[in-house]
Amino acid sequence: MKGYIPQITGKYKKDYRRCEKRQWEMNLLDDAIEILCRGEQLDEEYDDHPLYGKWVGCRECHIGGDWVLVYKKKERYLILRRTGSHDDVFSR
């Protein structure tokens, strides 16, 4: 099975801190990232799907409720682009 090395963007770091301040269950996000880094598919509950338009080439999965993770797989890297609510990620 192919594994990926996580690569974090500056926006993702800011998003992550915002989620922590909101006291969201960060272990849920970390679990999803761990699954993706192992090269495994996420369960259906994550509603993992490709994005289009400005985000073409990226994927989005739902961590819980309105909480999403936007990522991209490139070569051996899992690029963590954004995380937060839909408004946080797609309205800026």
Descriptions of predicted regions:
Residues 1-5, 11-17, 21-27, 31, ...:
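Enriched for short, Lys/Arg-rich terminal
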Residues 35-62:
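A short, surface-exposed loop/turn module that caps and links secondary-structure elements
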